[in-house]
């Protein structure tokens, strides 16, 4: 079973994403910010991370840069899930090591397509 770490400071977004991912047969873990997410990745690296941009403690971009700098051999796919929709944000995320980008709010079909594009669904 594929695993996914949902990283978002919104409990509502985490709940919706969890429901969608579980219907797609993913094992799901959650983190409320980038710092907590890094800790979870050190314990058990997921196959994919759904990542919010703006969070307290550590932003999604900070998390992504640190994750990629650590150079683990089992790097997860990273899909940014955010309301930031301008080209500068999208380009910055991809340059920092994100694999895909999805806009909030998202539905099951959209998320499933993005997960297929990165090779985990």
Model-found features: residue ranges?
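Charged docking surfaces used in two-component/phosphorelay signaling
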Residues: 15-23
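Active-site beta3 strand of CheY-like receiver
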Residues: 44-50
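Alpha4 helix (beta4-alpha4-beta5 surface) of REC/receiver domains from two-component response regulators
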Residues: 62, 85-100, 110
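A Lys-centered signature of the CheY-like receiver
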Residues: 104
């Amino acid at each position: 079973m594929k695993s996914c770490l949902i990283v978002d400071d919104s409990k509502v977004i985490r709940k919706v994403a969890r429901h969608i991912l579980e219907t797609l047969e993913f094992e799901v873990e959650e983190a409320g910010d980038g710092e907590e997410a890094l800790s979870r990745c050190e314990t058990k690296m997921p196959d994919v991370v759904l990542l919010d941009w703006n969070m307290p403690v550590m932003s999604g971009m900070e998390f992504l840069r640190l994750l990629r700098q650590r150079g683990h051999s089992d790097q997860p796919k990273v899909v940014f899930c955010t309301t930031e929709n301008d080209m500068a944000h999208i380009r910055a995320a991809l340059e920092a090591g994100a694999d895909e980008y999805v806009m909030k709010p998202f539905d099951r079909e959209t998320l499933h397509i993005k997960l297929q594009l990165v090779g985990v669904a």
